[in-house]
């Protein structure tokens, strides 16, 4: 008990400092085109591709160089030749409610052969809204062949914690995140999809080797559970490792190595406290529950994540670039042998970073809200 009280006192002190640090976060530093930016290990140039956006949520760079950007209101915007075009593609059946709306966008690993684009969004149902995954093909300025593949159950009137990031492993499997919709108990309940990371075939079928596929008391789509609201997910195809960042409450954001069938603890264990300052749990570790590789106190509100690959940014290879909504920067997180080493702020005060993506060209794309824009990072030797 004494150790718990000491830990809580320490955490509260850090949150108090965070309140002071956040006081100047309305001071946004928009990038100056062509200016060389220095980081600890890599210099780069920032180019602004689009401004005046409202609530950009997801980014996908096509093989032909066009950049697709989702607006939470239900539209896909197109950037071509480094400029925002007038083209807007409306996605049907999007329910804009609270934090919900049109969210992530990604292409199939064999996009150049099959043309499939995958979308996540909140959809209206009889009992409220629910996280939904669909796929479609681009046909000019509209979508065609749209197929709804999955909807997280149960639907609810709650407007929070939809999760909604989508990644592929290159073997025909799709992973995507589902938040607990603001109800803590959902995360430990295997009878629903909320507070989970889920795994399906690329056409929506349930893989026969999913961890709970033969458990009648669990949803067969579940890959891992005990999550709060994961809004950054990447799959490292070199090491066959799934990684995710998720929002904690007040403090306790996490970077996790996500493994088959494992429990990531929320809300039984957490390094955060409730927004009103009261404890959520008096323990931070428990047998049978996974520890984060990195956790943040105070919260940075992680949203969007890329893992740097290729030869364009050699000094950042395998580093994670994590969007920080609350702290308005991109966090460069360095690991060694799966353990946290260090972190650096990039693009400090650029705005609420919602999405970070590495394109097939090896360059880094970042979307922000407040102000709403998309920028591109190119290396400088």
Task: Give short role names for the model-derived ranges.
Residues 131-141, 190-203, 258-259:
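Beta-propeller blade signature
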């Amino acid at each position: 008990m004494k150790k718990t009280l000491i830990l809580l006192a320490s955490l509260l002190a850090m949150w108090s400092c965070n309140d002071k640090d956040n006081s100047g976060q309305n001071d946004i530093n928009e990038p100056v085109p062509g200016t060389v930016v220095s980081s600890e290990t890599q210099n780069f140039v920032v180019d602004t591709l689009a401004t005046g956006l409202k609530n950009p949520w997801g980014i996908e760079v096509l093989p032909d160089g066009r950049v697709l950007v989702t607006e939470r209101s239900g539209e896909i915007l197109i950037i071509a030749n480094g400029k925002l075009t007038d083209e807007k593609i409306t996605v049907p059946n999007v329910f804009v409610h609270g934090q919900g709306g049109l969210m992530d966008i990604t292409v199939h690993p064999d996009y150049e052969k099959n043309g499939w684009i995958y979308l996540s969004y909140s959809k209206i149902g009889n009992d409220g809204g629910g996280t939904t995954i669909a796929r479609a093909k681009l046909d000019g300025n509209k979508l065609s062949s749209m197929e709804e593949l999955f909807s997280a159950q149960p639907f609810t009137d709650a407007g929070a914690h939809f999760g909604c990031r989508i990644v592929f492993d290159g073997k025909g499997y799709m992973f995507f995140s589902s938040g607990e919709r603001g109800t803590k108990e959902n995360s430990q309940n295997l009878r629903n999809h909320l507070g989970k990371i889920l795994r399906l075939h690329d056409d929506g079928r349930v893989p026969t080797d999913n961890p709970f596929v033969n458990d009648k008391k669990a949803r067969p789509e579940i890959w891992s559970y005990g999550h709060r609201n994961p809004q950054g997910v990447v799959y490292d195809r070199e090491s066959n490792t799934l990684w995710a960042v998720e929002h904690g409450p007040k403090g306790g954001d996490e970077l996790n190595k996500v493994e088959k069938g494992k429990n990531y603890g929320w809300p039984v264990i957490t390094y955060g406290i409730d927004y009103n300052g009261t404890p959520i749990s008096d323990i931070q570790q428990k047998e049978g529950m996974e520890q984060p590789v990195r956790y943040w106190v105070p919260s940075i509100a992680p949203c969007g994540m890329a893992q740097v690959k290729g030869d364009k940014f050699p000094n950042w290879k395998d580093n994670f670039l994590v969007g920080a909504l609350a702290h308005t920067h991109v966090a460069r997180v360095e690991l060694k042998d799966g353990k946290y080493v260090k972190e650096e702020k990039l693009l400090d005060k650029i705005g609420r970073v919602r999405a970070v993506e590495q394109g097939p060209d090896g360059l880094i794309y970042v979307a922000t809200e407040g102000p709403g824009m998309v920028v591109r990072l190119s290396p400088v030797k």
